[in-house]
């Protein structure tokens, strides 16, 4: 696994910081905090935050002013100078760390991890090391915010300076199955210099731990608890089916695929065809030693009209105890 920054990376960043007369001159400088940070600050109490590639320091200072204990990490000394100076001017403090994220030893989990455009500037051979560090840094109930450029059309060049453009499905696949998308936003920039490949879509990801991956038994129990809450005896139907697939009354053939896809339980980070859903659930359950056929049947009955229609075409979220579900993100 390659971890050391390449000559191209170092040359590009050192040249840019040597050229800049102030933090405002940096091509990646921004006045407003990265999208999603304000909402995160409203939703949760301040904790430990890690700003990977802090750059001009805008996000580090914003979070520190909101009461967060901020670690500002960058391998460029001048980036840390800008960040600390802006923190002093704002009357707050941050913890500067001069290090390369791909080589840094993560000291503790963080409640919030932020990357405002570092990943898309890294050499792809270092991506596995980056991924490993991010997964180590995000706490079990933590949030990860990522800014990354997307191509505006298939095959769009990245330009001599980059950044590298990567589509949404590839980004989600890169962090799957450990992390899953909570929210997504995008901005369109139709015309930029050829040096950076012209226009781009600037994408923002708010990711969290995928508890269907890390806590599979908890998910199964939450489904069972929902049946109990609604006074539905699901065990009789499971016992009757045994090792055979159940055949309940369904409103649509794709309901199991919708249930376990990215819009609900998140067993898969991409949409599934109806024919693939049963096998995916059984594989997932087998890896978790949960009884593949029984779990697949349980999830199928969860979508069935004749077993409460709990998570069918119109899910009854108000009657549901499944917290490991994307539809519950506002609840």
Language-model segments: what does each one mean?
Residues 2-44, 48-50, 56-108, 122-133, ...:
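Class I (Rossmann-like) S-adenosyl-L-methionine-dependent methyltransferase catalytic domain
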Residues 114:
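A conserved beta-strand element that flanks and buttresses the S-adenosyl-L-methionine
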Residues 117-121:
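Short catalytic micro-motifs in class I SAM-dependent methyltransferases
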Residues 202, 214-331:
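C-terminal accessory module of base-excision DNA glycosylases/AP lyases that mediates lesion recognition
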